[in-house]
């Protein structure tokens, strides 16, 4: 769960007040994904800091990160609307990356390697949610968004997982986007493009299903969405 936290552990560099940051977090946080995807049977890796402090699913090299051009690379310097929110010095960047970004990725890599040692394979479920209306900086501006979205990797996502996902959500009565409106799924760099025993699939949930948007108040369908998410996780695990 890379984007479920609202914790900002270090305020250095921010040029906006707490009220502004709270408003931005309301928009950008993947609300309650740590609960919606919770499983006592699996290893849960949760970033304990907000994405507007450090986004663990961005590349650290801005030349490789498409969102860096909008000031929303690994360390957000602009809001979704484009306002300047933080001034990041080289020293601050190094501190945040070393103390937070790489610490998170080290935990992630250790968890994946433990699964490989125990079972010879590992399945990563990259857990997210998204607003029903595109964000200002979203690359996909199509306003007609599906209920759920899976993201895939051409090397690390087996076709059978894609097919299973499509049939599951169709049979359950939900719409599903494949690599739409968001694409890709995370893999530790040490295994990326090298080890097919490390499998990955991203699942994104449309927040309109479980929140009373634009608030972060849980809707009456929250438990329904949590249950269907749990069923999906059990299904793809059983297919391994």
Placement of each model-derived feature along the sequence:
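N-terminal catalytic or cofactor-binding beta/alpha core of small enzyme domains
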Residues: 1-124, 129-240
């Amino acid at each position: 769960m890379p984007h479920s936290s609202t914790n900002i552990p270090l305020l250095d560099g921010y040029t906006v007040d707490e009220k502004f940051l709270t408003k931005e977090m309301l928009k950008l946080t993947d609300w309650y994904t740590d609960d919606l995807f919770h499983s006592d049977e699996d290893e849960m890796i949760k970033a304990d800091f907000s994405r507007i402090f450090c986004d663990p699913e961005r590349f650290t090299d801005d030349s490789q990160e498409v969102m860096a051009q909008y000031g929303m690379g690994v360390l957000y310097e602009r809001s979704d609307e484009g306002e300047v929110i933080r001034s990041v010095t080289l020293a601050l960047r190094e501190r945040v990356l070393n103390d937070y970004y790489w610490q998170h990725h080290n935990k992630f890599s250790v968890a994946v390697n433990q699964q490989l040692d125990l079972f010879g394979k590992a399945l990563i479920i990259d857990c997210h949610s998204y607003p029903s209306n595109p964000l200002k900086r979203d690359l996909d501006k199509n306003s007609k968004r599906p209920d759920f979205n899976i993201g895939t990797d051409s090397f690390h996502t087996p076709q059978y997982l894609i097919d299973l996902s499509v049939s599951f959500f169709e049979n359950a009565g939900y719409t599903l986007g494949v690599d739409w409106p968001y694409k890709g799924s995370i893999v530790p760099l040490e295994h990326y493009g090298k080890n097919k025993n490390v499998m990955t699939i991203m699942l994104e949930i449309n927040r309109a299903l479980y929140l009373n948007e634009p608030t972060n108040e849980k809707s009456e369908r929250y438990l329904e969405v949590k249950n269907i998410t749990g069923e999906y996780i059990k299904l793809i695990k059983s297919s391994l």
